[in-house]
C-alpha cells in the first residue's frame, strides 16, 4: 500500500541543490575556502607565534607565550569571521541590485 501525493515531488533534485548551477558552485567554493582559512590561520599563527616570536625572539616563558599566542589566534578567528560576513553581505547586496535591474 503506497501513498503518494501528486503535490509532493519526490525527486532528488528537490532535496539537493543543483551543483551545476553557477551560484551554488560559488557558494560551496566560498564555504570551503573560509572553512579552511578559519582552521589554518588561527592554528598556524598560534604555534608559529608561540615558537618563533614569543619564545624565540622575545624570550617569553612557554606558558605565557602559549597564552599570548592563543589570544591572538582567537582575535584572528573573529577577523576571519568578520571578513566572511562582510563578503557575504556584499555578495547579497550585489544580487539584490542585479534583481532590481531585471
Swiss-Prot record:
Subcellular location: Endoplasmic reticulum membrane; Endoplasmic reticulum-Golgi intermediate compartment membrane; Cytoplasmic vesicle, COPII-coated vesicle membrane
Biological process, per Gene Ontology: vacuolar proton-transporting V-type ATPase complex assembly
Record topological domains on the Cytoplasmic side: 1-33, 89-102
GO cellular component: endoplasmic reticulum membrane; endoplasmic reticulum-Golgi intermediate compartment membrane; ER to Golgi transport vesicle membrane
Record keywords: Cytoplasmic vesicle, Endoplasmic reticulum, Membrane, Transmembrane, Transmembrane helix
Ranges annotated as spanning the membrane: 34-54, 68-88
Membrane topology: Multi-pass membrane protein
Main location: endoplasmic reticulum
A Pfam entry, by short name: VMA21
Lumenal side: 55-67
Domain of life: Eukaryota
HAMAP family assigned: VMA21 (MF_03058)
Function noted in UniProt: Required for the assembly of the V0 complex of the vacuolar ATPase (V-ATPase) in the endoplasmic reticulum.
PANTHER family the record matches: VACUOLAR ATPASE ASSEMBLY INTEGRAL MEMBRANE PROTEIN VMA21
Other remarks in the entry: Based on the gene model, may be part of a dicistronic locus.
Family: Belongs to the VMA21 family.
Name of protein: Vacuolar ATPase assembly integral membrane protein VMA21 homolog
Organism from which the protein derives: Caenorhabditis elegans
Lineage: Eukaryota, Metazoa, Ecdysozoa, Nematoda, Chromadorea
Amino acid at each position: 500500500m503506497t501513498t503518494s501525493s501528486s503535490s509532493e515531488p519526490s525527486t532528488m533534485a528537490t532535496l539537493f541543490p543543483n551543483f551545476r548551477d553557477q551560484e551554488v558552485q560559488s557558494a560551496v567554493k566560498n564555504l570551503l575556502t573560509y572553512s579552511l582559512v578559519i582552521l589554518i590561520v588561527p592554528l598556524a599563527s598560534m604555534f608559529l607565534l608561540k615558537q618563533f616570536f614569543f619564545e624565540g625572539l622575545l624570550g617569553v616563558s612557554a606558558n605565557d607565550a602559549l597564552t599570548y599566542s592563543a589570544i591572538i589566534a582567537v582575535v584572528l578567528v573573529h577577523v576571519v569571521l568578520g571578513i566572511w560576513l562582510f563578503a557575504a553581505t556584499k555578495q547579497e547586496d550585489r544580487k539584490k541590485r542585479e534583481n532590481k535591474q531585471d
